[in-house]
Structures are given as C-alpha cells and as structure tokens.
Swiss-Prot record:
List of residues that carry Phosphotyrosine: 172
Residues that bear Phosphoserine: 49, 76, 170, 444, 554, 785, 792
Localization, UniProt: Cell membrane; Nucleus, Nucleoplasm; Cytoplasm; Cytoplasm, Cytoskeleton, Spindle
Compositional bias segments (type: Polar residues): 878-907
Species per Swiss-Prot/TrEMBL record: Drosophila melanogaster
Name listed for the protein in its UniProt record: Guanylate kinase-associated protein mars
Length: 921
C-alpha cells in the first residue's frame, strides 16, 4: 500500500470497513455477556423468601430528578419510615410467584417501551441549526450533546427527564472499611475553602457486615442516581476533551488523587447509612462560588465536563485505573460544577484527559457481578451513524487544519541514534508545549524538535564539529506512481497535501512548513509522453514483473472522462508519433549532409567511384522515410482514431479498416528500427571510406606468404633392407622343394581311394598362426587359393612353403604324441559343420616369425616337428575340412599309431579327425 499512499484519500478508523471482523467478534462477545447476565438473573430468585425487593424504577427516577446532588440524609423521616413497610409488604411470602413474575414483567415491558421510544427519538435527532439550549429537551437521553449544567438554567434542569436503567441492578452495598478509615488531611488546593470539600464522613469506620445489614434503609441512597447508558463515540469524546478541559481540585487519599466532583459522587453513592450528607452539602456552596466558564466554540454541541468510568460490577460507584504518580496541574482555575453521576465508563474512559485526570485505587473494589452492557463497547460504526450531529461533526472535521504529512525518508534527525524509548520527550505540562511549539495541532510526531536556543541536553551531546553533510543523493529506483486528480471540492478538503517545503536553518535543523491546502498539481509535461512498452520489463522475476505491471497501469488512473484503455492508447500514440518525427528528422539531416559533400567533392568521388555509394545510401534512406515511415504514421493516426472515436471508419474486414492497437504500433516500430539501423550502417561505411580518402579500407596490401620450408630428406638415411635368405638357406629350400615333388610323383593315389590331389598350384594354400591381439587361445586360420595370387607375392613365401613341406615330411614319418585334452572340453559333443572363414592377411596377421634350426631337420627330426606342432595341427584341421573327406568314427581308438589311421583331437567342444598332411601336400 505504500505505492498507493498518494493516490487514495485516507479514511477514519471508525468509518473504515476494516472493523467488520472486529465487529463480528464484538457481537459474539456481547451475545455471550448477555447470555451470562440472563442466566444470573434467572438463578437469583430461587424461592419466595423475604428477599428485599428494590423500589420501582419510575419512583426512583422521579426522586433523583429533584435530588441529584443531595445525600440520603436530606430525605424526610416519614419517607424513610414508610420504605421498610413497603418493602415488607412487597416481599410478603403470601404473594404467589406468578403474580410477582407478572409484576416484574409488566415493569420491564413499560421500561422497555420507554427506552425504544427514546432511542427512536434520539436516532431521528434534531436539525443541525437547532439552538443548543433546546437540545436537553429534544435529545433527553443524549450524553454526548447535552448542555452543561453550569450553562443551563434551573428550570431546564428541573424539566430534564431522567432515564430508567435498561437492566435490573444489584441491591448489594459496598462497604470499604479499610479504605475509608485512612482518609488523610487535605493538601492545599488552588480553590478557596478546600477543607470542607475533603471532610471525611462520620461513619467511615463502619464494618462491611453492618453495612450489609442496613442495606434496606440505604436502598434509597443507592437508587437516587440511576445508571444511564453512555454514548461511546470516540470522535465526539475527543471533541469534548478538546473543547472543555477543566482543571480539577485535588484531595489526598490513601493511594491516589481525586477530583472534587468524583469525591462528591463517591460519598453520595457508597455510604451505607443515610446520615452523612453534610459533606456534600458543605462542598456544593464552595464550588458554586466560582464563576461559570463560557465556551467560545462555534455552534457545535457543547460537551459536558469529563466524566469518570464506571466499573462493570458496581452500578453507581466509579473507579479508575491508576495512572501513576503524576503531579497535579494547577495552572488554570476555571472549575466546572460537578455533574451528577450519569453512568460513565465504556469507551469514554479511553479518551480521558490525562493531563489533569486523577486516579482512584482499583484495590478498593469488591467485584460481585457484571451489569455493564457489552454492546456499549461494540457496534461503534452503528452508534456513530445514529448520531444526530454526525454531519455537523464531519463538516467541522473537514474544515480543521490538517496536520502536515511528514515523510520519514526526507528528514534527517540527528538524535535518532541517541533516542531510547521516545524520540521527543517533553514535560507533562501542556503549557510548555504551547510555548515551545505554538499550535500543537500541526505538530508532527516524527519531525525533529525545534527548541529555543541550545539548552537541550540532547543537542549538547552532539559533537561540536559535526554538521549535516549533504552527501551524494542515492539513485532511486524507477517510480511509476503519479498523482491523481481530485474533481470534487469535498475530496479536495479531505486529501492530505503531499507538497511541503523543507526550511533549512542556520542551526542545522530542518523544519517542514506545509503549503496551502490545494490539490497536488499534475506532472509538468516536458514534451515526452508517458509511455513504457508493454514488452519491456525493467525488473527481473515473475513477482517483480507483476508488480511492475500494476505500477505501469497506475500511470493511467481512470477518471470519468476516459477509461484506462483509451488513456493508454493515447499515450502510445503520442510516444510513437514523437519517435517517428525524431527519426525522420535525423535521417533527412544525414541525407542533406552527404548530398552537400558529394557536390563539393564530385571530381574525386567520380574518380574513385564513391559517388555511387553515396547515391545508393541516400536513395535507400529516402525510400525508408517516404514509404515505410509514412505508412507507420498512418497506422498511428488510425490507432488514435480508434481510441478517441474521431474520424474512425467502420470495420468492414479489410486491411484499411481493421483496428490498430498499441501492441501493433510496437511491432511496427521494431521493424522500422531494423531498417533504420541498416541505413545507419551504410552511413558509417561511407565515413570509413571518406576517412581513407575513398580507397577501400579493407583492401590492405597483403605480403606474399612464404611457404613453410619442407623438411629436407637426407640421402644418407638408412633404409631398412629386406632380409635376404642366406646361401645355405636357399640351398636347403631348393632341396626340400625337390624332395616334395619327388614324393608327390611316387604316391599317385591316396590310401582311402580318393582321387589324387592336383599339383601344388591347384591345391589351397593354408597358413595357420596365432593372432597376438586376440585373447582367445584358438588359432587364426589363413587360407588363400592358388589362383588369387602368385606364390612369390610375399617376400617370405618360399621360406614358408619350404618349412611347411619339411614339417609334413617329418610328421609323416613320426607322428607327434597326442597332446593333453583340456578339462574345459566336453568329449561327447556332436560334430558341427565347420565353416571356413577367410581372413585378411593385412588385418589379422601382422608378422610371421618361424623358429627353425639349420641342419636339425635331417639329424634330429623330432625337434622341428615339435616346434611346428601348432602349425601342423591347425593346418591339418583346415585341410581336412576343406577337402570334404570322409568322416571317421569318433569312437575309434585314438591310441592307434598306424599312419593310415587318422588322429583324433579335441578342439573346443567337438572332436576332429585329422588325416596325415602327406595327403594334401
């Protein structure tokens, strides 16, 4: 609500709608109190015992009419003698309970009817211009607007009717032997004849039990002053307090200071026997010697003297909350005649005059029951609305001087750090405030105190050299709020004025001087429209953006003339029209500048070709300003016509008649800005050419790049020579090859009847090695057909073939022993069909290395056979699968050493029958 502080007028707390929840709670509280009170009354009379019955309320009211301030001693003895007889007669046990109930009901009904009539008369009220003297008759029950007794005549006092209490009241008496026995001597008051006012009664030492025993004879004393409902209006009570503020007389009691009027009331209403009326009788003439005080207020209802609060459990004995040890103020001597007790208490106790009010000790009270009506404290709004002088008070409040608005952030108080409980402490005397500040109505509660001179203790605590240094003002955030316009004169009088002038004095104090009451002026227009794009956010976050949107909408406070959307559209029109005019003016100035330059330097520009660049840029700029921007100007006019309703065309669905919104103007302007920036880049390029004397600034003379020197290859580098077989090895290979041919010629047919194999060139050439990169222990089989390549395609082909042939020869003569069978192999698995896989020699086999020993083939043939065992077995396996030979029986004994019988090996999970290599090579 801080950002809306200046936008809306403030309402009073009593009339504001904030009291709805409190009002509901007060209703429930009043209902509960009424229920408890009804329960109490129903349970009081439980039998037809000789319980003392109080006198009729009407008779008590008539008696109190003429004897308001008279003690019970002034009554005639005949009347005192007849009262016990009447009470005994009324409480006769022979009377049936039904008759008593009917009698009480009829009395209650009569009192209720009178109360309703008085309430209706009070609610209707009198005219505003009725003279004040007649208000006691027109509004007989009004406690707020009745005439003070010191101004009314005796005839009006006698004619003023008294009221009946709305509820049944207690018959019990209050005896206070402890408090009354300690009445001290009076101190010297400012009023003459003070001793008679404070004379203690003669029966102060009576015990509580004796007072209760004689409560029948004192019943008239308790009923002389009936309770009247207090009208608890905070506004009216505040006016009363400000209008008539008497300085009371003071007498010393045990724990508190009392006013003379309250003393008289206390003595009148709480004495258990009707004898000590001389105190009041002696006090009254002494007070009447003072001249009456005539009020100088205008013709508003004149309030009475301040009345004291009444405790909820006692009907006619008021008490107050102790206010502490405050010294009595005896500056003014205008004493008002004490008023009769008319039911104080309620909300009026909150508005008592604290400067001159006295306090009574709450410890003297004896709480018995609650007879206070709770509704007096509640339903403040309804009670205020029913006041007859409400309009007059509101007009009077509107014409009062309004206190200045004191913003905390604009005032520097040098005593903020030194303040403890309060910032501004003063004496209890209001006269000192008047001397120091003059009119206290316009005193700001937070402004620095302006004292006369340097006598203040706080100011002496300040360092001497310390002065208010005007530091740099911090940069404030962007504020979207704006003042509203008050149209009616009533609002002008009620709106607080935010315009103030700060006056700097030589002493360093800053004083706020309020200006004249007037409506804050609107923001002065400096030619810039009040527009912010709806697509632009100057804050971060969803919550901040939402608050920013609310502030932006608060720009356009709706009034009676135009709604919010219209004002927003008009602001957009003004903004974009101004932006468009500025942009067109700027671009046209650039075109004129370059045209003048091209005419002055036409020869140089034609020589270098720069005149064409200038003409192209100027042409694009004029095309933009005369076409696109003129079209945008037409859209702005259409948006304004749609918002104001002037020169607007009906929407027939065509492009020319569609309504244009502020968001459409925003999008168009963004597109125009892109084209305008493109034109600006062209003008910047012209400036670059102009600075380079119309030579291409990007065409820099590039130096020929020297190629990087390649690394020289030295002819002395060692080239790996291919391994050449030694002469002994060549001879060995030739010999082995010849022996192989001889062996094939001698064996034309195979033992098993298969056709003889073809020559070595037609048979598949198989090389089996281990792949060193593979983790599997299985051997890699390389198979190459004869027709795919020559035998001498590899440098070691001759060597390999010779070694394999020699190994086959040795294996044919002496077969190697059977190797161990792996424990991971299963012997009884069925034979799977083998698939020949052709591997690339370059990928799988990187290098072949055969271990051999020269000369050991012929001498020790077993060594070579053992070293080439892996190669021999795998080669035999591949040869057996490729040749498609007959399958041998796996169950045949594998221990047969005959050459014709094939060997059986276990490979992985199957058995493989191997035939001798001599059949293939």
């Amino acid at each position: 609500m801080q950002r809306h502080k200046e936008l809306y007028k403030e309402q009073s707390l009593v009339l504001s709608p904030r009291n709805h929840c409190q009002e509901n709670r007060d209703r429930l509280q009043a209902a509960r109190a009424k229920k408890r009170e009804d329960c109490f009354y129903q349970n009081r009379i439980i039998s037809v015992s000789p319980t003392p019955v109080k006198i009729k309320q009407l008779a008590a009211a008539q008696a109190a009419l003429t004897q308001e301030n008279v003690a019970p001693k002034l009554e005639s003895p005949e009347r005192l003698d007849t009262k016990p007889a009447e009470l005994l007669k009324e409480s006769n046990p022979k009377v049936s309970r039904q008759k008593l109930y009917l009698q009480r009901y009829m009395e209650w009904k009569i009192a209720k009817t009178k109360e309703h009539k008085q309430q209706d008369q009070k609610r209707r009220g009198a005219a505003i211009n009725v003279p004040t003297v007649k208000q006691s008759k027109a509004l007989p029950k009004s406690q707020t607007f009745r005439v003070p007794d010191n101004l009314a005549s005796a005839k009006q006092k006698e004619a003023a009717p008294m009221f009946q209490p709305p509820k049944r009241c207690s018959l019990y008496m209050i005896a206070n032997p402890t408090g009354k026995g300690k009445a001290a001597e009076p101190i010297k008051p400012s009023i003459p004849k003070p001793t008679s006012a404070a004379a203690p009664p003669s029966s102060n030492t009576v015990a509580a039990s004796s007072a209760l025993a004689r409560h029948k004879s004192a019943a008239s004393a308790t009923k002389i002053v009936p309770a009247i409902r207090q009208n608890n209006n905070p506004v009216a009570l505040a006016r009363q307090k400000a209008a008539a503020r008497p300085i009371p007389n003071t007498t010393k009691q045990t724990t508190s200071v009392r006013q003379p009027g309250i003393e008289a009331k206390k003595i009148t209403t709480t004495i258990p026997r009707p004898t000590p009326a001389t105190v009041t009788k002696a006090k009254t003439p002494g007070i009447r010697q003072q001249p009456p005080v005539v009020s100088t207020k205008p013709r508003l209802p004149e309030p009475p003297a301040p009345r004291t609060a009444r405790l909820p459990n006692v009907l006619s004995k008021p008490f107050e909350k102790p206010l502490g040890n405050k010294a009595p103020v005896t500056r003014r001597a205008n004493v008002v005649k004490p008023q009769p007790i008319r039911g104080g208490g309620g909300a009026a106790a909150k508005f008592k005059d604290t400067a001159g009010a006295t306090s009574k000790a709450a410890s003297h009270s004896i709480r018995m029951k609650a007879t206070k009506i709770k509704s007096q404290y509640t339903r403040l709004q309804d009670n205020v609305r029913k006041l007859p002088q409400l309009k007059a008070e509101l007009l009077h409040a509107a014409t009062l001087d309004i206190p200045p608005l004191t913003p905390l952030d604009d005032i520097h108080n040098p005593f903020i750090d030194q303040a403890t409980s309060t910032q501004c402490k003063s004496n209890n005397s209001s006269g000192h405030l008047l001397e120091a500040f003059g009119d206290t109505i316009l005193l700001s509660p937070v402004a620095p105190v302006k004292a006369e001179g340097e006598s203040s203790v706080k100011r002496q605590l300040l360092p001497e050299g310390k002065k208010e240094a005007s530091g740099p003002v911090a940069k404030k955030k962007f504020d979207f709020t704006r003042y509203s316009v008050a149209n009616s004169p009533a609002e002008d009088s009620l709106i607080l004025d935010p315009q103030q002038t700060t006056v700097k004095e030589d002493t360093g104090d800053s004083t706020l001087v309020p200006e004249g009451t007037k409506t804050p002026p609107r923001r002065e227009s400096n030619g810039m429209p009040n527009y912010l794009s709806p697509f632009v956010s100057v804050s971060r976050g969803k919550v901040n953006s939402r608050c920013e949107k609310e502030k932006r909408n608060s720009f356009y406070l709706s009034n009676e003339e135009s709604p919010l959307e219209v004002r927003r559209a008009i602001e957009s029109v003004l903004y974009f029209r101004l932006q468009l005019e500025n942009e067109i003016t700027r671009l046209q100035a650039l075109c004129a500048e370059w045209e003048a330059y091209s005419k002055e330097n036409e020869a140089r520009l034609q020589e270098t070709g720069g005149i064409d660049m200038i003409n192209v840029t100027i042409g694009q700029t004029r095309l933009l300003t005369t076409k696109k921007m003129m079209q945008f100007s037409g859209l702005i006019d259409r948006c304004e016509a749609g918002a104001t309703g002037k020169n607007s065309q009906p929407n027939d669905g065509s492009e020319d008649s569609k309504p244009v919104q502020a968001e459409d103007l925003e999008g168009w302007w963004d597109m125009l800005r892109l084209q305008s920036e493109n034109v600006d880049k062209r003008f910047d390029n012209l400036k670059r050419w102009k600075a380079n004397d119309w030579l291409d600034p990007d065409a820099v003379a590039e130096e020929p790049k020297q190629p990087k020197p390649k690394p020289k290859i030295s002819r002395n580098m060692k080239i790996k020579s291919k391994a050449k077989p030694s002469s002994n090895l060549q001879q060995f290979l030739r010999k082995a090859h010849a022996n192989m041919k001889k062996t094939k010629v001698e064996e034309p047919t195979l033992e098993d009847g298969l056709p003889a194999t073809s020559s070595r060139h037609s048979s598949p050439r198989v090389i089996v090695v281990r792949n060193r990169r593979s983790f599997s222990p299985a051997r890699t089989v390389l198979r190459m057909s004869t027709g795919e390549g020559r035998q001498s395609i590899a440098p070691n082909a001759l060597l390999k073939s010779a070694i394999l042939a020699a190994a086959e020869q040795n294996a044919a003569k002496t077969p190697p022993p059977k190797p161990r069978t792996s424990i991971l192999k299963t012997p009884g698995t069925t034979k799977r069909q083998n698939r020949g896989v052709l591997f690339s020699a370059k990928k799988s086999v990187r290098r072949f290395q055969f271990t051999y020993e020269e000369g050991n083939i012929s001498n020790d043939e077993t060594v070579g056979a053992d070293k080439l065992e892996d190669c021999e077995e795998d080669m035999s396996l591949e040869a057996s699968t490729e040749s498609g030979s007959l399958e041998q029986n796996p169950g045949r004994d594998s221990n047969q050493e005959n050459e014709a019988t094939p060997r059986t090996y276990t490979l992985r999970n199957r058995r493989v029958n191997l035939r001798p290599s001599s059949e293939f090579m």
